[in-house]
Amino acid sequence: MLKVKVKKLLSYRGYYGNIKYSPVDRVLYGKVIRLPKTFISYEGNSLAELEQDFHNAIDAYIELCEEDGEKPKKSNLNDYN
């Protein structure tokens, strides 16, 4: 599977996610970066869909943490290259 890397980050509510493209699947996808012990992914057929799914994933993560009485972790970009 050929993958193309794009040097761009999405940002929302203190969370950051990468953007990747799969030409085989013809879909944009990514995951929230620098979030300890937590995996959040998202995808879309366009940049608008990708960004909306990213926002929805972050909102769902925060809501789940609140329901469980936990403080949501934030992305840490202090040493991100």
Map each language-model feature to its residues:
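Short, charged, surface-exposed hinge/linker loops at domain edges
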Residues: M1-N18, D25, T38, A48, ...
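Short beta-strand motif preference
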Residues: L28-K31
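Short glycine-enriched loop/turn motifs at secondary-structure junctions
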Residues: I33-K37
